[in-house]
Amino acid sequence: MKLFYRFRIIRIMFSITINPRFGDMDYLGHINNTVPSLWFEVARTQVMKIFDPELTLTKENFQLIMAHTEYDFVDKMYFKYEVEIKTWISRIGTKSFTVYHEAWQQGRLCVKGSAVIVHYDFDTNQSTPIPEDKKKLLEEHLLPKEASI
């Protein structure tokens, strides 16, 4: 009898570790529901460096705006344990892309969320196509299609 195992490798674009602060707790001792959005924002910094490596944040270099965010709270998180934030690119379109995040604590998925980022011209106030060289860099970190979100 032959056994076949199928392994799936998912590249993590970025992984950061957060040490929750005392002020991140609610009165029940859980991490407050407003906090993961801030952690995900910190994790997106590496994605933003694809477009503006020095993070100069000028309208000439940083032509991105956030159009939509959403979060699903899957399990509780607590103050005294580190949180790992994993970040991928889950979709690349013509003018926008989606960043997908997961917050893990003690081996448990606790929060998952995404942010739609639009390539934007601040002078014309219109979305613009993502430059091909930036798309290629984003594609290097694309979550495989077979991965379930």
How would you name each of these model-derived features?
Residues 2-84, 92-149:
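Terminal targeting signals and extreme-terminal segments of soluble enzymes
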